[in-house]
C-alpha cells in the first residue's frame, strides 16, 4: 500500500491510494490529480455520503473500495469505470444499483452486501466477466430469470435474503464452485441444482427445506454441504454419490435415521447430526474411514453402532443428552479419539476397552448412572475427567476397590456412584416429597411451597411435574438435628436394605423417600462390597418390604427426622433403611457389606472441618499422638485397616474383620462428637477407648511429644529435628562467574514460605560456589561485609557482582539432626503384615513383589530430572503437616507420574518411591510445603535421592550428597545374564526377561556424571538404521568410544547394544529418544548393555601417505542418499567403491572395494551424509587411521544392482539426479578418472567429478586448467535413451598391479554409454590431447597400469560426462533426436553429392601438389590404421594373449570396419554363416554389464566417425586453401600449422621410456607450459549447425557437406580445427593419404569443428 502525501512537486504518477479508516466525509481533492495513472483507490471505513462528479473521471480505476460508508446513491456515471475489475460498495445505504452498471464489462468481483436493495437491474446479467458476486443481506426477493448468463461466476453469495425459489437457469453456471443460500425462505430446491458440475460448497442452512432433491447426488465435486436448521425428515439415498464430500452438517432438523449410503462417503471428515430425532445410527457409518469429528448431541439414541470401532481417525465424539445405556466394546478401536463426551445419558458402566483409546485426553460422563469406573482407565493420559456438572477440578483422586458383582478392580471417588439431576421421569417421585415433610413440628414450616393451593394426593405427581421439583426445605435447628439423627440411627437398626432391582416393586412411599434421600435413578448398580461371614442373615424380601412400609408410614416427628440426614456423599443409591440391626457411626467410613437379602450401600461422610476433632497441637496427652499416628481417623472411628487407601484429606475405608468392627462400635462415643462444646471431652474419650481396644498392639508408648509411627515396619520413631547453622564460605570467582543463582528478596516472591530473605536457588555442579560448599536452599546473610537481611533482590545481585575475585559470604543452612534414642519395635498384628500401598499403581505397572519379611529390603536410587515447560511431571504426597501417604509414615513419597512428562520420560521414578533428599537437602522429616518449595525452585534440574523397596540386595551406589564421585573412577556393577542371578538391576519384566534369555551377556555399567562428556556415540533406533550393528535385530548401539573417555574407562565397547538407560527401556526407542535419555542430567548414568559380537571383519588400519601422494579411493553411500550397499537399500553406510593402485591405499593393499568405513582418524562416519564423509576423508593428513569392517563382496554383489551406476555429467544432470550424483565421490581433491582397466572398481561405478581442476599424473605433462563455466552453457539433451544391447561382454582382464591378486570386474563396454552423447562430446571435444613421441614403436594397444584424465582422449572420458544410465525400455527402437527435418536432410544430401562429383576431379589434381606441405600438417598414420584403431576401444585387448572383445570385432577379409549397428548386424550374420556354432562365453554377463557394453560400444562408434569427419574437414580445407591461394602465398592454415598443437590418434600407444605409470594416452603430445582456456575457446564465433552430432543411424546417413566458396570462413575454420586437433607432425602425411582424403566428402564452409556451441 502506498500512502500518497501531496508534497510540492510531488510525483503525479500514482497508481494506488489507500485512505481507509481516515474519517473522511468527502473524497479528497488530491485524488483527482492522479486521474491518468490511478488504478487502485481504497476509501473503505469512512463517512462518505455521496460521490461527486469529478470522481467518475478516474477512468483508469481497476479496483475501487467504498465499503463501510454512508453512501446513499450510486450514480449512473459508474458506467465510466469501463476498466474496473473489483468493486466493493458493501455496508452502505444504496437503495438500488443503476442500470448503467452493465457497461462495466471488465468487472470480475462485485460486493453489494449490506445495502437495502430489493432487486437487481435488468442489465446486471450482462456482466459476463463477473466471477465473484456477493449479495448478502440485501432483502432480495427473487433472482433474475436470466442469472444463468453470468457464465463465469465462480462464487455466488446470497445469504440473509428473502428468496423463496431459485430460477432454473441457475444450472447454467457451470463454473460455479461456491453457492451460499443460507438464511433464506427456500422451501424446495430445483432439480437442476444437481447440474452444477464444479460446485464444491453448498450452503443451505436456515431455510424451510423439508426434503432434498435426489439429483443432489450428482454433485461429484461437492466438498461441503450445510443443510442445518431446516425441516428435513429424511435424506435421499443418492447422497452417497457425493464421493468428495468432507463436511456434512445436518444439525437442527427432524431426521430419524441416516441413509445407508452414507458409508460411501469415504472422504467424509466432519458429520454433525445434533438436535435431531435419531433413534439409531446406521452400521454403515463405520465405512467413513476418514471421519474425524462426529457430533450426535441431543438425539434419542439408545445405543451406538458396533462399526464405530472402525473409525480409526475419529478424534472427537460427542453423544451428549441422548438415552445411551451402554457403549459398545468396539469403541476401543477408535485409537485416535481425544475427546469423548457422554454427558447426560443413562450409562451404568463404561467398557474396559475404552482404555485402548490411547490418545484420549478428555472424558465427560457427567449426568450418568455410573457406579464406578473401570480400572483400565488408569492407562489413559487423561487431562480432564468430568463426573458432575459442579465438579471443581478437571481431575480427581480415585480409590480402588473390588466390584462385588464381577470381582474386578474398579475405581471410585466421592462423586461415584453418580447422582444425576432430576429429570421429567423423576418428577412423579419428587412431587410427593411434601407429604413426608407435612407432619413436621407445628412450630416450624418444613417445606416452603410455591403454589397457593394445597396439593392433594391424587394430583401430586402432576403438580410436581409442573413445578419441576422446585421446592425449598426449611433449615432445621441444630437442636432438632440432634433428635432427628438419633431417630434415623434407631430406624436403621430395624430393617435391612432392599435392592431396587431385586424384582419386588418398591412402595410409592419408599420410592419417594429414596428419591428424597439420594436423588439417584432406580436402575443404577451398587458399588463393590465385601462379604462378611459373621453377619446375621437378614429377613426375606417380603419381610423387607413390610418393614419398609412400616418404617415409611410411621407418622409425626419421626418421619420428619428420618427424612433429614446429616449431609453425606453417597457412593451407591441403595438407601440404608430403618431396620438395620447395626449401629452406624457418624464419622466412620462404612465398607459395603453384602447381606443375603440385599446390598448395603457405602456411605461416605463429608470431610470434617479443619478445626474439628483431632488437632495435634491441642492433644492433652502424648498417648493420643501415638494413637493418631497409628492410624486413627480424624473422626476417631478406629485405626486404618491394612489395605485401606487415602484419598487426599478424606478418610480411607477398608473391609475389616467383624470382631474388630464390633469392638470399635461398642466403645465409640459417637453421640458426643456433634457438639463443638464437648470437643475436648470427646477427644479424651476417643483416645482412651482406642487404647483399650488395641491392647497388646502397642507395648510401650513413649510419653514424648513428636514421636512418629512407621506402620509399614511397626516402629515408633522419634522424629528428627531441624537445626540451623551459620556458615562462612569463601568463593574464588572465575571467568565464568560464581556458578550460583539467587531468589527471593524483599518485595519479591518468597523462595521459602513467607521468608523474604535471599536464598541460593541454583548451584552449578562444577562451579566455584559448589567447590566452596554452597548448597541450594542456603539463606544468604552477608556478602563481603554487606548485610543482605531485609535487602531487595537487585541489591543482592549488585552486592554479588561487585564483590571482587574473592567472595566471602555468610549463609544460614538448615539440616536434619537424627534422634539419639533407639527405635522402639512393636509387635506386628497378623492382619497388618503387608504393605498398605501395594495397589496404588495409578496406571503404571510396577514389578513389586510382596516382602517376605517384616522389614523389606530397600534400595536407593538417584534421579536427576530436567525441568520442562510443563514442570517435572510428578506429584508428591505426605510430609509433615499433610495427610500421610502411607499410614503412620510422615515421609514424602512420589504419588503420581504424569505420562509424557519429564519424570515419565526419565524412567527413574516410580509411584511409591520415598524421597530422601532434593538437591542435597534432606527431606526425610520435612514438611510438605518445604518439599514443594524445593521442587518448584528456579533450578532447571532437580536431583532426587529415592528409596524403593526391592527384593534383591542393594546395589553399591554411593549417596550423591555424601561424597561427589570423581570422574577418573567409574563405578561399574556387572551382572551376567544367567538365570537365577538375583543381582540384576530392577527392570521392567519384559526387559528383565530379554536380559535373562538373550544369547549374549548383559552388564550394567554405571557412569558418574561429573559434568563432562560421556565419550561415546550411538547409532540406530527404531527410526534409524543401525548398520553395521544389529542388522537382523535393530536397536541402539555404541558406535564410537573415545580412547581415554569416561565410557572407555568404564569398559564400554563399540558394538555394545544399549537396552536401558537409567531404567528406561530404549530397545524400541527412536534415535532422538535414546539421545535424550543419555543426555538427561543425572548424578549417575546407569546403562544396561548387551555385549553383542562385533561386526565381521572389524579392524583398524593405519595407512601412511607419501608427501603429495593421493589416497586413491572412492566412496559411495551415506545418509539421506543412495544406498551404498547393493544388498540392503536401507543401509546408509559408507563403502569403498574404487581403489586406485597408484594411491596410498592401493600401495598399502589392505583396503579393497566393498569394505565399510566406520571411523577415520577417530571421527565416526556413521550417520554422515555422503558430502560430509567426503569432506572428512579429504581433510586427513599424511596418516590415515581407519576403522573398517566387511561390507559386501564386489564380485558377487555387483550383479544385484538395478542400475549399472552413475555416469556423472555435471553439466547435463538435473535436479532429479542430485542425490545419485552425490552418492559416489573420489576422496582425492585433484583426482581425475583414470583408465577403466587400471583400477579396482565396482562394475558400473564411476566417479563424480567435482568442480576441481584435473591434474596430470604422468611425467612431462603440465596440469590443464579446465574452465567449466564455458562448458556449462551447453544445453542438456534431456532424457537418455538406452540402445538395446547386442553383444556379450568380454572376458575380465587381469590387472597387473592388483595388490590382492583378485580379478576386478570388467569395465563398462561401449554398449553401456547412452545413445545421445553429443552433449558430453561437445563439452569434451575441446580437451587438448598429446601425441606420443615419433620414435615410439607401433604395437598393439595395451593399457598401462595407470593413466591420468589428461592422458585419455575424449572418447575414453565420455563416460564420465554422461547422465545416469536408466533401465532400457521394452523392445523399442532408440529415440532419435533430430535437429534437421527429413526433407531438408534429403535435399542437403543430394546437393552435396552433386557438388562432390564436380569437385572430385579438381581435388585429385591439387592433392599431388599439396602433398609436401600437407606432410607438415597431418600425422603419419594411415587412414586404414586409424580406422582399425577406431573400431576397438583402448581397453578392448588388454594383452596379446587375451581375446578380442566382441563389442568391436575385427573386420573379416578386409571388410569395412564395424562402426554402426547395421554394420555390426551384418558382421554377426557373416560370423553365423561362417561358424554355425556360436562360441560360448566364458562368463555370463549380467543385463547391467550387457547394457554398459552396448552403450559404450556405440559411443565409441560415434566418436570414431566424428573424429574422421574432423580429419576430413582439416585435410579438405587445407587442399582447398592451397588450390585457391597458389604456391607463392602462405595461408593462415600453414601459419597455424607451425603452432604447437597436438593431433589426434585413435588409440593409445604405450611408451617404454615413460614407464607404466606415465604412458601417454592416445593422440596426445606434451604441452610445454601451454594451458588451454575454455573461455577463450567458447568465445570463438560459430555458425555451424549441430546436425552432424546425431544418433548413430542418422549420423551414418549424413555423408557429405557442401564446399566453401570463399576463403575467409575457411581460414577461420582452419584455426578452430587446429586448435581442436593440435599441431601435426612434419612429414606425417603422404600423397596416398591426401588421395584417400580427397576421395571422401568435403566440408561445408560453416563447419568449425566439434567444440562447444557458445550460448
From Swiss-Prot:
Gene3D superfamilies: 2.30.42.10, Ribonuclease Inhibitor
Bias (Acidic residues) ranges: 556-565, 660-694, 1422-1432
Superkingdom assignment: Eukaryota
Modified-residue entries (Phosphothreonine), positions: 378, 475, 689, 826, 1342, 1545
Location of the region described as Required for interaction with VIM in the Swiss-Prot/TrEMBL record: 728-1194
Gene Ontology cellular component list: adherens junction; basolateral plasma membrane; cell junction; cell-cell contact zone; cell-cell junction; cytoplasm; extracellular exosome; extrinsic component of postsynaptic density membrane
Keywords assigned by UniProt, alphabetized: Cell junction, Cell membrane, Cell projection, Coiled coil, Cytoplasm, Developmental protein, Differentiation, Disease variant, Leucine-rich repeat, Lipoprotein, Membrane, Palmitate, Phosphoprotein, Repeat, Synapse, Ubl conjugation
Basic and acidic residues bias (residue ranges): 479-494, 829-841, 1227-1242, 1353-1365, 1383-1395, 1461-1472, 1524-1537
Biased composition (Low complexity): 537-555, 1409-1421
Subunit structure: Interacts with UBE3A. Interacts with PAK1 and PAK2. Interacts (via PDZ domains) with VANGL2. Interacts (via PDZ domains) with LPP and TRIP6; the interaction is direct. Interacts (via PDZ domains) with TJP2. Interacts (via PDZ domains) with APC; may mediate APC targeting to adherens junctions of epithelial cells. Interacts (via PDZ domains) with TSHR; regulates TSHR trafficking and function. Interacts with ARHGEF7 and GIT1; interacts directly with ARHGEF7. Interacts with CTNNB1. Interacts with MAPK12. Interacts (via PDZ domains 1 and 3) with MCC. Interacts with DLG5. (Microbial infection) Interacts (via fourth PDZ domain) with tick-borne encephalitis virus RNA-directed RNA polymerase NS5; this interaction targets viral NS5 to the cell membrane periphery and nucleus and prevents STAT1 phosphorylation, and thus, the activation of the JAK-STAT signaling pathway. Interacts with HPV E6. Interacts with influenza A virus protein NS1; the interaction results in the translocation of SCRIB from the cell membrane to perinuclear puncta.
Name of the protein: Protein scribble homolog
Organism whose genome encodes this protein: Homo sapiens
Amino acid at each position: 500500500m502506498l500512502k500518497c502525501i501531496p508534497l510540492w512537486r510531488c510525483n503525479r504518477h500514482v497508481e494506488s491510494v489507500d485512505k481507509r479508516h481516515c474519517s473522511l466525509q468527502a473524497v479528497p481533492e488530491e485524488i483527482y490529480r492522479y486521474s491518468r495513472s490511478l488504478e487502485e483507490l481504497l476509501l473503505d471505513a469512512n463517512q462518505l455520503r455521496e460521490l461527486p462528479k469529478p470522481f467518475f473521471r478516474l477512468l483508469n480505476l481497476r479496483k475501487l473500495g467504498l465499503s463501510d460508508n454512508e453512501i446513499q446513491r450510486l450514480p449512473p456515471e459508474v458506467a465510466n469505470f469501463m476498466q474496473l475489475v473489483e468493486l466493493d460498495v458493501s455496508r452502505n445505504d444504496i437503495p438500488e444499483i443503476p442500470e448503467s452498471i452493465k457497461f462495466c464489462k471488465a468487472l470480475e468481483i462485485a460486493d453489494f452486501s449490506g445495502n437495502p436493495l430489493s432487486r437487481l437491474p435488468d442489465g446486471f446479467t450482462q456482466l459476463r466477466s463477473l466471477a465473484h458476486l456477493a449479495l448478502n443481506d440485501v432483502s432480495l426477493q427473487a433472482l433474475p430469470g436470466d442469472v444463468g448468463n453470468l457464465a463465469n461466476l465462480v462464487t455466488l453469495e446470497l445469504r440473509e435474503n428473502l428468496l423463496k425459489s431459485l430460477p432454473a437457469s441457475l444450472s447454467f453456471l457451470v463454473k460455479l464452485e461456491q453457492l451460499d443460500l443460507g438464511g433464506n425462505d427456500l422451501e424446495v430446491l430445483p432439480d437442476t441444482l444437481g447440474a452444477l458440475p464444479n460446485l464444491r460448497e453448498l450452503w443451505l442452512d436456515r431455510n424451510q427445506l423439508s426434503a432434498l432433491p435426489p439429483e443432489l447426488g450428482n454433485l461429484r465435486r461437492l466438498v461441503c454441504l450445510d443443510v442445518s436448521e431446516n425441516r428435513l425428515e429424511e435424506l435421499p439415498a443418492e447422497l452417497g454419490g457425493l464421493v468428495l464430500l468432507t463436511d456434512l452438517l445436518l444439525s437442527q432438523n427432524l431426521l430419524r435415521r441416516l441413509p445407508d449410503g452414507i458409508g460411501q462417503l469415504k472422504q467424509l471428515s466432519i458429520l454433525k447430526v445434533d438436535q435431531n430425532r435419531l433413534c439409531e445410527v446406521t452400521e454403515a457409518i463405520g465405512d467413513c474411514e476418514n471421519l474425524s469429528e462426529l457430533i450426535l448431541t441431543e438425539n434419542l439414541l439408545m445405543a451406538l453402532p458396533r462399526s464405530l470401532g472402525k473409525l480409526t481417525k475419529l478424534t472427537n465424539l460427542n453423544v451428549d443428552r441422548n438415552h445411551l445405556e451402554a457403549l459398545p466394546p468396539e469403541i476401543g478401536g477408535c485409537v485416535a479419539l481425544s475427546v469423548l463426551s457422554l454427558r447426560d445419558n443413562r450409562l451404568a458402566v463404561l467398557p474396559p476397552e475404552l482404555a485402548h483409546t490411547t490418545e484420549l485426553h478428555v472424558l465427560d460422563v457427567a449426568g450418568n448412572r455410573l457406579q464406578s469406573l473401570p480400572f483400565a482407565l488408569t492407562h489413559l493420559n487423561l487431562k480432564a475427567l468430568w463426573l458432575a456438572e459442579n465438579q471443581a477440578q478437571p481431575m480427581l483422586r480415585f480409590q480402588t476397590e473390588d466390584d462385588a458383582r464381577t470381582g474386578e478392580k474398579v475405581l471410585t471417588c466421592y462423586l461415584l456412584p453418580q447422582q444425576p439431576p432430576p429429570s421429567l421421569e423423576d418428577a412423579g417421585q419428587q412431587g410427593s416429597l411434601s407429604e413426608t415433610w407435612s407432619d413436621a413440628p407445628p412450630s416450624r414450616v418444613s417445606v416452603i411451597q410455591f403454589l397457593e393451593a394445597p396439593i392433594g394426593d391424587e394430583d401430586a405427581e402432576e403438580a410436581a411435574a409442573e413445578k419441576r421439583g422446585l421446592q425449598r426445605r426449611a433449615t432445621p435447628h441444630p437442636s432438632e438435628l440432634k433428635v432427628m439423627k438419633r431417630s434415623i440411627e434407631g430406624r436403621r437398626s430395624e430393617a435391612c436394605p432392599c435392592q431396587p432391582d431385586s424384582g419386588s416393586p418398591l412402595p410409592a412411599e419408599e420410592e419417594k423417600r429414596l428419591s428424597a434421600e439420594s436423588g439417584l435413578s432406580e436402575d443404577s448398580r451398587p458399588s463393590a462390597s465385601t462379604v462378611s461371614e459373621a453377619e446375621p442373615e437378614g429377613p426375606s424380601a417380603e419381610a423387607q418390604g413390610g418393614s419398609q412400609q412400616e418404617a415409611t408410614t410411621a407418622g409425626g416427628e419421626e418421619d420428619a427426622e428420618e427424612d433429614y440426614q446429616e449431609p453425606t456423599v453417597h457412593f451407591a443409591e441403595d438407601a440404608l433403611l430403618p431396620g438395620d440391626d447395626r449401629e452406624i457411626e457418624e464419622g466412620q467410613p462404612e465398607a459395603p457389606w453384602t447381606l443375603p437379602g440385599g446390598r448395603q450401600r457405602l456411605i461416605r461422610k463429608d470431610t470434617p472441618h479443619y478445626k474439628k476433632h483431632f488437632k495435634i497441637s491441642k492433644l492433652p496427652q502424648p498417648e493420643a499422638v501415638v494413637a493418631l499416628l497409628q492410624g486413627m481417623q480424624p473422626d476417631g472411628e478406629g485405626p486404618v485397616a491394612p489395605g485401606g487407601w487415602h484419598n487426599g484429606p478424606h478418610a480411607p475405608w477398608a473391609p475389616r474383620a467383624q470382631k474388630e468392627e464390633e469392638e470399635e462400635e461398642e466403645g465409640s462415643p459417637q453421640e458426643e462428637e456433634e457438639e463443638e462444646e464437648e470437643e475436648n471431652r470427646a477427644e479424651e474419650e476417643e483416645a482412651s477407648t482406642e487404647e483399650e481396644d488395641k491392647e497388646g498392639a502397642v507395648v510401650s508408648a513413649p510419653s514424648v511429644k513428636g514421636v512418629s509411627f512407621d506402620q509399614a515396619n511397626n516402629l515408633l520413631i522419634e522424629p528428627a529435628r531441624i537445626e540451623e547453622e551459620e556458615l562462612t564460605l569463601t568463593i574464588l570467582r572465575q571467568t565464568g562467574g560464581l556458578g550460583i543463582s539467587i531468589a527471593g528478596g524483599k518485595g519479591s516472591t518468597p523462595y521459602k514460605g513467607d521468608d523474604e530473605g535471599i536464598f541460593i536457588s541454583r548451584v552449578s555442579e562444577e562451579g566455584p560456589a559448589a567447590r566452596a560448599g554452597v548448597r541450594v536452599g542456603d539463606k544468604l546473610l552477608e556478602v563481603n561485609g554487606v548485610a543482605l537481611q531485609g535487602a531487595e533482590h537487585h541489591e543482592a545481585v549488585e552486592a554479588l557482582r561487585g564483590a571482587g575475585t574473592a567472595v566471602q559470604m555468610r549463609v544460614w543452612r538448615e539440616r536434619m539432626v537424627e534422634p539419639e534414642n533407639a527405635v522402639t519395635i512393636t509387635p506386628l498384628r497378623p492382619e497388618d503384615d503387608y504393605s498398605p500401598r501395594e495397589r496404588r499403581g495409578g496406571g503404571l505397572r510396577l514389578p513389586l513383589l510382596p516382602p517376605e519379611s517384616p522389614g523389606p529390603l530397600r534400595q536407593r536410587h538417584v534421579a536427576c530430572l530436567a525441568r520442562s515447560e510443563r514442570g517435572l511431571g510428578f506429584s508428591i504426597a505426605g510430609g509433615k503437616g499433610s495427610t500421610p501417604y502411607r499410614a503412620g509414615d510422615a515421609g514424602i513419597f512420589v504419588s503420581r507420574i504424569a505420562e509424557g512428562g519429564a519424570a515419565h520420560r526419565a524412567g527413574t521414578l516410580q509411584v511409591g518411591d520415598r524421597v530422601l533428599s532434593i538437591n542435597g537437602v534432606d527431606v526425610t522429616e520435612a514438611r510438605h510445603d518445604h518439599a514443594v518449595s524445593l521442587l518448584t525452585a528456579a533450578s532447571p534440574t532437580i536431583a532426587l535421592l529415592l528409596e524403593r523397596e526391592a527384593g534383591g540386595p542393594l546395589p553399591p551406589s554411593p549417596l550423591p550428597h555424601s561424597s561427589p564421585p570423581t570422574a577418573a573412577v567409574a563405578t561399574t556393577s556387572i551382572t551376567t545374564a544367567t538365570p537365577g542371578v538375583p543381582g540384576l538391576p530392577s527392570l521392567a519384566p519384559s526387559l528383565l526377561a530379554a536380559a535373562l534369555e538373550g544369547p549374549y551377556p548383559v552388564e550394567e555399567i554405571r557412569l558418574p556424571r561429573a559434568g563432562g562428556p560421556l565419550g561415546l556415540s550411538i547409532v540406530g533406533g527404531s527410526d534409524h538404521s543401525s548398520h553395521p550393528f544389529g542388522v537382523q535385530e535393530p536397536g541402539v548401539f555404541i558406535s564410537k568410544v573415545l580412547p581415554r573417555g569416561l565410557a572407555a574407562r568404564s569398559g564400554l565397547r563399540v558394538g555394545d547394544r544399549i537396552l536401558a538407560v537409567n531404567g528406561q527401556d530404549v530397545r524400541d526407542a527412536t534415535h532422538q529418544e535414546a539421545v535424550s535419555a543419555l543426555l538427561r542430567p543425572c548424578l549417575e548414568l546407569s546403562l544396561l548393555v548387551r555385549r553383542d559380537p562385533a561386526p565381521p571383519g572389524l579392524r583398524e588400519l593405519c595407512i601412511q601417505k607419501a608427501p603429495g601422494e593421493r589416497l586413491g579411493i572412492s566412496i559411495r553411500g551415506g545418509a539421506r542418499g543412495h544406498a551404498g550397499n547393493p544388498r540392503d537399500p536401507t543401509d546408509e553406510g559408507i563403502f569403498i567403491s574404487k581403489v586406485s593402485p597408484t594411491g596410498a591405499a592401493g600401495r598399502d593393499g589392505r583396503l579393497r572395494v566393498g569394505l565399510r568405513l566406520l571411523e577415520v582418524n577417530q571421527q565416526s562416519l556413521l550417520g554422515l551424509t555422503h558430502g560430509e564423509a567426503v569432506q572428512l576423508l579429504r581433510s586427513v593428513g599424511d596418516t590415515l587411521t581407519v576403522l573398517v569392517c566387511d561390507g559386501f563382496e564386489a564380485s558377487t554383489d555387483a550383479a544385484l544392482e538395478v542400475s549399472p551406476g552413475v555416469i556423472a555429467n555435471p553439466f547435463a544432470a538435473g535436479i532429479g539426479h542430485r542425490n545419485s550424483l552425490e552418492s559416489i565421490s573420489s576422496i582425492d581433491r585433484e583426482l581425475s578418472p583414470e583408465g577403466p582397466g587400471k583400477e579396482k572398481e565396482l562394475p558400473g561405478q564411476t566417479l563424480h567429478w567435482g568442480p576441481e581442476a584435473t591434474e596430470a599424473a604422468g611425467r612431462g605433462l603440465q596440469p590443464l586448467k579446465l574452465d567449466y563455466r564455458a562448458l556449462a552453457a551447453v544445453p542438456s539433451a534431456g532424457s537418455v535413451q538406452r540402445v538395446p544391447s547386442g553383444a556379450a561382454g568380454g572376458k575380465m582382464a587381469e590387472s597387473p598391479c592388483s595388490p590382492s591378486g583378485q580379478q576386478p570386474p570388467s569395465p563398462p563396454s561401449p554398449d553401456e554409454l547412452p545413445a545421445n552423447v553429443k552433449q558430453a562430446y561437445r563439452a569434451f571435444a575441446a580437451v587438448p590431447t598429446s601425441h606420443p613421441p615419433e620414435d615410439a614403436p607401433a604395437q598393439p594397444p595395451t593399457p598401462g597400469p595407470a593413466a591420468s584424465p589428461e592422458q585419455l582422449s575424449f572418447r575414453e572420458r565420455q563416460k564420465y560426462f554422461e547422465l545416469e544410465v536408466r533401465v532400457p525400455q521394452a523392445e523399442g527402437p532408440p529415440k532419435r533426436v533430430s535437429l534437421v527435418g527429413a526433407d531438408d536432410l534429403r535435399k542437403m544430401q543430394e546437393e552435396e553429392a552433386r557438388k562432390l562429383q564436380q569437385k572430385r576431379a579438381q581435388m585429385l589434381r591439387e592433392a599431388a601438389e599439396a602433398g609436401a606441405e600437407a606432410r607438415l600438417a597431418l600425422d603419419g598414420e594411415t587412414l586404414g590404421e586409424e580406422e582399425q584403431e577406431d573400431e576397438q576401444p583402448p581397453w578392448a585387448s588388454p594383452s596379446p594373449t587375451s581375446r578380442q572383445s566382441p563389442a568391436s570385432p575385427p573386420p573379416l577379409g578386409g571388410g569395412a570396419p564395424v562402426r554402426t549397428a547395421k554394420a555390426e548386424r551384418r558382421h554377426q550374420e557373416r560370423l553365423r554363416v561362417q561358424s554355425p556354432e556360436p562360441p560360448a562365453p566364458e562368463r555370463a554377463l549380467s543385463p547391467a554389464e550387457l547394457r554398459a557394453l552396448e552403450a559404450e560400444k556405440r559411443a565409441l562408434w560415434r566418436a570414431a566417425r566424428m573424429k574422421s569427419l574432423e580429419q576430413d574437414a582439416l585435410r579438405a580445407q587445407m587442399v582447398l586453401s592451397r588450390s585457391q591461394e597458389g604456391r607463392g602465398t602462405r595461408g593462415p592454415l600453414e601459419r597455424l600449422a607451425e603452432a604447437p598443437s597436438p593431433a589426434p590418434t585413435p588409440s593409445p600407444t604405450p611408451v617404454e621410456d615413460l614407464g607404466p605409470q606415465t604412458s601417454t594416452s592416445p593422440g596426445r603430445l606434451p604441452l610445454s607450459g601451454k594451458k588451454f582456456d575454455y573461455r577463450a575457446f567458447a568465445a570463438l564465433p560459430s555458425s555451424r549447425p549441430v546436425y552432424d552430432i546425431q544418433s548413430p543411424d542418422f549420423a551414418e546417413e549424413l555423408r557429405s557437406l557442401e564446399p566453401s566458396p570463399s576463403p575467409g570462413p575457411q581460414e577461420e575454420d582452419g584455426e578452430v580445427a587446429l586448435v581442436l586437433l593440435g599441431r601435426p607432425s612434419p612429414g606425417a602425411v603422404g600423397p596416398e593419404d591426401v588421395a584417400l582424403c580427397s576421395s571422401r566428402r568435403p566440408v561445408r564452409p560453416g563447419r568449425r569443428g566439434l567444440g562447444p556451441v557458445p550460448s
